[in-house]
């Protein structure tokens, strides 16, 4: 197939927006080393992905499920990043409280910060 048109692909994926998403997903897979289902020649991954769709070489349901799995993994990663950031803030606040306690002890004793630390405060 020398040229791929949207009309060739829309016969297999009726929604043009979904077509773009699925073709992009497949192009990413190809970029990561997935084996192409059509001859590559010198075509870019996006063209190869569209040719695979137009020639019915891919299972669209499998490609859709892969997309859902990636989205779920991204959500989990985001939650983990949020939790880590939240813990870091909590630790910073706890460290700030300890510094304030140390400052209070230093004031009570009339010592400087370095002197208070040397004494174990």
Swiss-Prot record:
Biological process terms in GO annotation: DNA-templated transcription
Assigned EC number: 2.7.7.6
InterPro entries from the UniProt entry: DNA-dir_RNA_pol_omega, Pol_omega/Rpo6/RPB6, RPB6/omega-like_sf
Compositionally biased region (Acidic residues): 103-121
Transmembrane segments: none
Signal peptide range: none
Region called Disordered, residue ranges: 95-121
Keywords: DNA-directed RNA polymerase, Nucleotidyltransferase, Transcription, Transferase
Domain of life, per lineage: Bacteria
MF annotations from Gene Ontology: DNA binding; DNA-directed RNA polymerase activity
A GO cellular-component term linked to this record: DNA-directed RNA polymerase complex
Catalyzed chemical reaction(s): RNA(n) + a ribonucleoside 5'-triphosphate = RNA(n+1) + diphosphate
PANTHER family in the cross-refs: DNA-DIRECTED RNA POLYMERASE SUBUNIT OMEGA
Record text on subunit structure and interactions: The RNAP catalytic core consists of 2 alpha, 1 beta, 1 beta' and 1 omega subunit. When a sigma factor is associated with the core the holoenzyme is formed, which can initiate transcription.
Similarity section: Belongs to the RNA polymerase subunit omega family.
Summary of the function given for this chain in its UniProt record: Promotes RNA polymerase assembly. Latches the N- and C-terminal regions of the beta' subunit thereby facilitating its interaction with the beta and alpha subunits.
Name of the protein in question: DNA-directed RNA polymerase subunit omega
């Amino acid at each position: 197939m020398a040229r791929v048109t949207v009309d060739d692909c829309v016969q297999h994926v009726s929604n043009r927006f979904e077509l773009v998403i699925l073709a992009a997903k497949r192009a990413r897979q190809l970029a990561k080393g997935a084996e192409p289902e059509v001859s590559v020649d010198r075509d870019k991954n996006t063209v190869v992905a569209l040719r695979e769709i137009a020639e019915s070489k891919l299972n669209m349901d499998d490609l859709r499920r892969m997309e859902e799995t990636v989205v779920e993994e991204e959500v989990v990663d985001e939650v983990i990043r949020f939790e880590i950031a939240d813990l870091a803030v909590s630790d910073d606040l706890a460290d700030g409280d300890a510094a304030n306690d140390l400052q209070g002890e230093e004031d009570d004793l009339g010592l400087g910060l370095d002197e208070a630390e040397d004494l174990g405060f």
